[in-house]
Amino acid sequence: MQSSIPSVSVSVASPAMETPTKASPDSKSPNSVGAIPSSSPLASSTKASTSTPFVENCSNLLCDLASIVEDSPPTLTNTSLSPHSFSLSDMESSMSNWLNPFAFDNTMNSAPPLFTSTNMGSPNSLENSTNPLLSNCGSPNSFQNETFTGPSLNEFDADDKIQRQMKILHSVDTIDPSTVQNYPSADMSNPEVKLKTEEIITPMDTTCKPEPSAKKIKLSPSSEDSCSIPETLPFSAPKSRGSLSPSETPDFVAGPGGKPKKTAHNMIEKRYRTNLNDRICELRDAVPSLRAAAALRCGNSLDDEDLGGLTPARKLNKGTILAKATEYIRHLEAKNKELQKTNKQLSDRLAFYEDPSMAPPSNDTRAVNSVNVVSSSDYSVHQSSRPNLTQRAFTSPTLNTMGRTALNGMVGLGLFNYFGNDSSQSVYGLFALPPFLMSPFTGTVLFNMLKIGVVLLGLFYLLHDNSLFKGFKGEKKSKVSTRSSMSPSSILFRKTVFEKYCLLDHSTSTISLFFGLLIFTLKSAYGYLTHRLSALYTSSENWVYSEQQLAEVRNMEKLLDAQLMGGDAKVDRLRLLMVFASSFSLPPSSHTCALQAMYCQLIFSNTSVPSAIVSKCVAFFWNAAKKQHSKSSVHAELRELPECTANLIENSHADDVFSPNMVERLWVLAKCTRDSAQMSDSIISSLSDVLVLSPLEVLASWYAADLLDALLMESLSRKVEISEIEEIISLCPKNSSIIRHALLAKLVLFPENTADSLNEVLAAYKNTLDLCSQDKRKQSSVLKINLSKLFTLHSCLSLALQRLGYGDVSKRMYQEIFVPDSDADITPLSFIISWTALNTFAPICTSPKENDVVEKMAMYVRTAIGTLKIQDLKLSRKLINSCIDIGSRLQEDLGYVSSA
């Protein structure tokens, strides 16, 4: 009968946590929804030291980034590292305290019972007890508002019907602080109820002995009715361990006395076994390895069975079937994840190398070059379905220059041959023109005048870009939306911009390129002379550009940026030279001069031109950019440089910026390949970074990355000044990944400014996550986060919290660090952060899990020393010996722990 007593199975709190007997007036009621007391040891120990939001912001940042990274540790995505978060043991103890006011005393379910001498002297003293766990038998919420006079212990042996009703009222499923007040109380003190009594509790000692059991009496019908459940309370039969299907519900058969008689227990168990065996057979037929085992038993071959890398089962018992089913589920999950990764890689590759196809030739008699421009809205919406992209063709800004030039040459050659063919034939008959006009002298003069007129008209037509003849075109150009929602650094967008503003022919013949270079040179000379002549009559301070001139200047700047950022699919030195020649038609500005320096370096480096001459030319354009930037306020309407680019031009020299390694990376960028993302010394890949908008910003970010790597390696042998890291931060584009890395380096290298540096790091990542929340497609291109960078950030935040005095929280965060096994993404930043964190946490780590992270981090540091190829042998030996000492100390500590 002891098992029939209603109870609630909850975990019991520690002995030190006593349940309050009376709620204070100003305290929150334990029955209120969500009132979970912070009784966990971690929360109580860190409550005084975690008043600042540093810990919460750090843990939230790690969880947000881990949810984006593939194969991230589950400890970061499923749990919070906040000191106020509950672990499993903390949650059990807290839920135990929370449910104690609603639950029956645990002593009713355990033998021997534990009664304190202060609250109960004998079993008869239950009536005067104030323990809410014992006085709550009537209603789960009535222990604070009313005093319940409970029966003695030997009166708990009630009839089976009453016990079943009480079990429904106080089962685990029905105890809910939001709904428990709706249930009526089961009044156990009704005097009309006559219960049969029996001794059900084994006496523990002399202080707690049950009274002699009374005689068994039979319940009258009236007593049964008085103890029944009210009709408003929904009655549900107690659930058995195995769930029955609707067809397997036990049948009720009327007995001889009219009372319902249940089906025999053996029949019910037989139905359970039959149903379970059928389900196991279905599971066996669904798993390939189990089907293969069944086929082998029948003597069939396994040629038609696709095991998918799984081994067939040897047995077909129930345990093997369940084990093989679990193995097959995990195999399918791994295969599904691998397929998702492959699909993502293929889609990224397709998006990167996608090139808009050329439009079909027009039916117009004129030779028109048409190019397909992908609508920005269609690209943003239907990016995944490439074949269904809506394409619109628009005519090129200029006619076919090469064909027009060749046609003019042929006409001139024909005229030259016609007038130059001086035959000695006589003139017979009369002619409409006077004879003196046909004299040799007159013919020579007319021929020379015609040649001069043709040349002048051709030059005027080419240099003015057909601006005077636009009104005579019969067919209007289709308007193309200038606004685009695509990323400015998208390779497709850059190619579209280059095709829109470039005058180059797609032919690769030498003659076409030569004529194109000649035309660009003439236009550049004409624009340069026009600007100089205008400057003679108007001072530079009073020079005002018209809207048309500004539009032409901006279009040309877009052309330069697009070609240097991979917009020209057939880029080579000659095509770069033609666009470089056309850049001289632009008014001088700091942006144009800096781009001309980049063009000069790319065109003439690693050629037959001496490197000294190339360096002088590059330095000339770079110094011109500095001069133009110093007086940039004169032409405020021209393009304004970003802050990082302006700092790069002002505070650096051309020889330092355009190193051989930098020139190689710029060539890779211009050729629109992904090799720059695989370069060992490149922290960011500007090809897919949507926040790097121009080649000058790419140059600044790569130069800052080189300076940061050099500074981090020098920090091992000398003390770094804070002005050096501030200079690097000033060269980084806003919200780019390089500025976040520079802020992490500042946080690690300068312990005295930990609080300010941590605020800057959290603010930088918050701004980046806000940008990602606006457009989900930019997560991979803006964050550029992976497991290695997540490890670097995790270690840096743990180190910062340790320096700020959050010892317990930092150790808890440190033990959840996932150290990557691969050495492919090791950078100087990850090496310095892991080395500093290792020296900080190795002396204070005590638990086995913390020591495991320390050991893995020591191995990571040793791997980084070999990967980065540190030139100083003494420094390398010192670092390796320190890692070995830490490892040997851990082995001693582990032995001490095991012996203890």
Curated annotation (Swiss-Prot):
<feature type="topological domain" description="Cytoplasmic">
    <location>
        <begin position="1"/>
        <end position="442"/>
    </location>
</feature>
<feature type="transmembrane region" description="Helical">
    <location>
        <begin position="510"/>
        <end position="530"/>
    </location>
</feature>
<dbReference type="GO" id="GO:0045944">
    <property type="term" value="P:positive regulation of transcription by RNA polymerase II"/>
</dbReference>
<dbReference type="GO" id="GO:0046983">
    <property type="term" value="F:protein dimerization activity"/>
</dbReference>
<dbReference type="InterPro" id="IPR011598">
    <property type="entry name" value="bHLH_dom"/>
</dbReference>
<keyword id="KW-0812">Transmembrane</keyword>
<feature type="modified residue" description="Phosphoserine">
    <location>
        <position position="898"/>
    </location>
</feature>
<keyword id="KW-0472">Membrane</keyword>
<feature type="region of interest" description="Disordered">
    <location>
        <begin position="1"/>
        <end position="49"/>
    </location>
</feature>
<keyword id="KW-0805">Transcription regulation</keyword>
<dbReference type="GO" id="GO:0005634">
    <property type="term" value="C:nucleus"/>
</dbReference>
<dbReference type="GO" id="GO:0000978">
    <property type="term" value="F:RNA polymerase II cis-regulatory region sequence-specific DNA binding"/>
</dbReference>
<keyword id="KW-0443">Lipid metabolism</keyword>
<dbReference type="Pfam" id="PF00010">
    <property type="entry name" value="HLH"/>
</dbReference>
<dbReference type="GO" id="GO:0000785">
    <property type="term" value="C:chromatin"/>
</dbReference>
<dbReference type="InterPro" id="IPR019006">
    <property type="entry name" value="Sre1_C"/>
</dbReference>
<keyword id="KW-0597">Phosphoprotein</keyword>
<dbReference type="GO" id="GO:0001228">
    <property type="term" value="F:DNA-binding transcription activator activity, RNA polymerase II-specific"/>
</dbReference>
<feature type="compositionally biased region" description="Low complexity">
    <location>
        <begin position="1"/>
        <end position="16"/>
    </location>
</feature>
<keyword id="KW-0256">Endoplasmic reticulum</keyword>
<dbReference type="GO" id="GO:0001216">
    <property type="term" value="F:DNA-binding transcription activator activity"/>
</dbReference>
<comment type="subunit">
    <text>Forms a tight complex with scp1, composed of 4 copies of scp1 and 4 copies of sre1, which protects sre1 precursor from degradation by the proteasome.</text>
</comment>
<feature type="modified residue" description="Phosphoserine">
    <location>
        <position position="899"/>
    </location>
</feature>
<dbReference type="InterPro" id="IPR036638">
    <property type="entry name" value="HLH_DNA-bd_sf"/>
</dbReference>
<dbReference type="InterPro" id="IPR052099">
    <property type="entry name" value="Regulatory_TF_Diverse"/>
</dbReference>
<feature type="domain" description="bHLH">
    <location>
        <begin position="260"/>
        <end position="332"/>
    </location>
</feature>
<feature type="region of interest" description="Disordered">
    <location>
        <begin position="206"/>
        <end position="263"/>
    </location>
</feature>
<feature type="topological domain" description="Lumenal">
    <location>
        <begin position="464"/>
        <end position="509"/>
    </location>
</feature>
<feature type="topological domain" description="Cytoplasmic">
    <location>
        <begin position="531"/>
        <end position="900"/>
    </location>
</feature>
<dbReference type="GO" id="GO:0098554">
    <property type="term" value="C:cytoplasmic side of endoplasmic reticulum membrane"/>
</dbReference>
<keyword id="KW-0238">DNA-binding</keyword>
<keyword id="KW-0539">Nucleus</keyword>
<keyword id="KW-1133">Transmembrane helix</keyword>
<keyword id="KW-0010">Activator</keyword>
<dbReference type="GO" id="GO:0032443">
    <property type="term" value="P:regulation of ergosterol biosynthetic process"/>
</dbReference>
<feature type="compositionally biased region" description="Low complexity">
    <location>
        <begin position="35"/>
        <end position="49"/>
    </location>
</feature>
<feature type="region of interest" description="Nuclear form of sre1; complements deletions of sre1 or scp1">
    <location>
        <begin position="1"/>
        <end position="440"/>
    </location>
</feature>
<protein>
    <recommendedName>
        <fullName>Sterol regulatory element-binding protein 1</fullName>
    </recommendedName>
</protein>
<dbReference type="Pfam" id="PF09427">
    <property type="entry name" value="DUF2014"/>
</dbReference>
<dbReference type="GO" id="GO:0032936">
    <property type="term" value="C:SREBP-SCAP complex"/>
</dbReference>
<keyword id="KW-0753">Steroid metabolism</keyword>
<dbReference type="GO" id="GO:0032933">
    <property type="term" value="P:SREBP signaling pathway"/>
</dbReference>
